[in-house]
Amino acid sequence: MKTPLTEAVSIADSQGRFLSSTEIQVAFGRFRQAKAGLEAAKALTSKADSLISGAAQAVYNKFPYTTQMQGPNYAADQRGKDKCARDIGYYLRMVTYCLIAGGTGPMDEYLIAGIDEINRTFELSPSWYIEALKYIKANHGLSGDAATEANSYLDYAINALS
């Protein structure tokens, strides 16, 4: 998995040199950023159940047909609601993985690469997940650098689905 730090080390190594002072300063900046990312990941993980539940409800409120239509892709029954929560949880986990990794690598490799095919195959609307991610962004309760870090990956996921 590529991160900004592994990229810098890889480039320097391929050129047979030590990291430059600028690259080292970037690394120190990344470590400061990592602290905020870890704080955000911890907070999102501890609030995951309530964020997922609220995000699912936001989807049902904006798209009421999702709870009225029958079928395996809708939330008309508890099984459908459980699937919806599971899928929202998957997006939230990807955000926390990115926060820990310090880059979009986990989301790029494990989610974005096949999301169009998954949504098409299972007849899932990206707009459902966009709404869920917007809810999480508006309600995660983070502030400062932790919020900035979390919001950047939430926005990345929203843009990938748009």
Swiss-Prot record:
PTMs per UniProt: Contains one covalently linked phycocyanobilin chromophore.
Sorted UniProt keywords: Antenna complex, Bile pigment, Chromophore, Electron transport, Membrane, Photosynthesis, Phycobilisome, Thylakoid, Transport
GO biological process: photosynthesis
Compartments (UniProt record): Cellular thylakoid membrane
The keyword NADP appears for this protein: no
Disulfide bridge positions per record: none
Keyword Electron transport: yes
Positions of (2R,3E)-phycocyanobilin binding: C84
Topology relative to the membrane: Peripheral membrane protein
Any Gene Ontology CC annotation: plasma membrane-derived thylakoid membrane
Alphabetized InterPro entries for the sequence: Globin-like_sf, Phycobilisome_asu/bsu, Phycobilisome_asu/bsu_sf, Phycocyanin_a
Subunit structure of this chain's protein: The alpha and beta subunits exhibit high affinity for one another and form heterodimers. These heterodimers form heterohexamers of 3 alpha and 3 beta subunits which, in turn, aggregate into a heterododecamer consisting of 2 heterohexamers.
Function: Light-harvesting photosynthetic bile pigment-protein from the phycobiliprotein complex (phycobilisome, PBS). Phycocyanin is the major phycobiliprotein in the PBS rod.
Family: Belongs to the phycobiliprotein family.
Protein name from the UniProt record: C-phycocyanin alpha subunit
Encoding gene, per UniProt annotation: cpcA
